[in-house]
Amino acid sequence: MKWLLLLSLVVLSECLVKVPLVRKKSLRQNLIKNGKLKDFLKTHKHNPASKYFPEAAALIGDEPLENYLDTEYFGTIGIGTPAQDFTVIFDTGSSNLWVPSVYCSSLACSDHNQFNPDDSSTFEATSQELSITYGTGSMTGILGYDTVQVGGISDTNQIFGLSETEPGSFLYYAPFDGILGLAYPSISASGATPVFDNLWDQGLVSQDLFSVYLSSNDDSGSVVLLGGIDSSYYTGSLNWVPVSVEGYWQITLDSITMDGETIACSGGCQAIVDTGTSLLTGPTSAIANIQSDIGASENSDGEMVISCSSIDSLPDIVFTINGVQYPLSPSAYILQDDDSCTSGFEGMDVPTSSGELWILGDVFIRQYYTVFDRANNKVGLAPVA
């Protein structure tokens, strides 16, 4: 019996795919460093709302890459045989996998890893085209099948996009090569099977769920666990929240309060839990009020800055979800970078039938270990350890 138990534990551990994430300077920070942010903001209106609920044709998805402006967490995957490595965003707010290819002549591709099908013995071409639109242009490419190495296992026969054009020279400064989407297949452009679905269908993960831990302090230590939960990353028990709409990881918020007073979402509202969005975003009017309450003001770079000395005096902002309170302290919702501090809130307006929509991005996820349960269509949350 003891040996059977040990064997079962070994089998489960082999079906838990652990993908380390590293924290790097964001695209925004790289643009500031290179004196390019003002030019970027002039030519690319940063609109986080355009990522969600796009109007799309059958072969067109709308996934604005400007919305990854502040993303800081990235993982490495390999594609092909032998594997060609790529740095990607593990994004619960989209569903496609795509990387640059050697067919791409855009400046944006020139400083990134590019997939070469000729160097892979397992690549299978298709005649399908992919176009992911955003801003003033679109990422165009083709779809193909190959083996994807993720967390030490081989995801065979995985469909993915190979970019041929990537508009906007700003992507030259992006700290990532491509995107690995972890949302539901219903929002996948071209009907492409997402990576996690393919892993589950092949029996490569032991549970139909995955979880995310984002470290607040270290460049390393963050992780995506495909197929399992690691209780060492959180304290107490997981609280489960039903997914309200299966597409994005969308849930219902009860309210948002400060000092016991409701400041937003007074009658309940919808929220998307999105690892591919760095900040906490909500309706522009509600966010404007919050920025005023915490003393944030816009600087010449379009950032909402705040005095770092305010961190010790400001109150928590509390998100109540499914009857459970999830407080964010000022040190969580105010972002410190050297001697400067910026607000972790950003305004957006998304026209949805469900009304007010919020995005719980990395500012929230850093404080709460998050489980994305596909089997039961639930999101699990617990304070990080």
Curated annotation (Swiss-Prot):
Disulfide bonds join 104-109, 265-269, 308-341. Its main location: secreted. Its EC number is 3.4.23.1. Residues 16-59 form a propeptide. Coiled coil: none annotated. Residues 1-15 form the signal peptide. It catalyses: Preferential cleavage: hydrophobic, preferably aromatic, residues in P1 and P1' positions. Cleaves 1-Phe-|-Val-2, 4-Gln-|-His-5, 13-Glu-|-Ala-14, 14-Ala-|-Leu-15, 15-Leu-|-Tyr-16, 16-Tyr-|-Leu-17, 23-Gly-|-Phe-24, 24-Phe-|-Phe-25 and 25-Phe-|-Tyr-26 bonds in the B chain of insulin. One of its GO terms (cellular component) is extracellular region. The active site is at residues 91, 274. Keywords: Aspartyl protease, Digestion, Disulfide bond, Hydrolase, Phosphoprotein, Protease, Secreted, Signal, Zymogen. Belongs to the peptidase A1 family. Shows particularly broad specificity; although bonds involving phenylalanine and leucine are preferred, many others are also cleaved to some extent. This is Pepsin A.
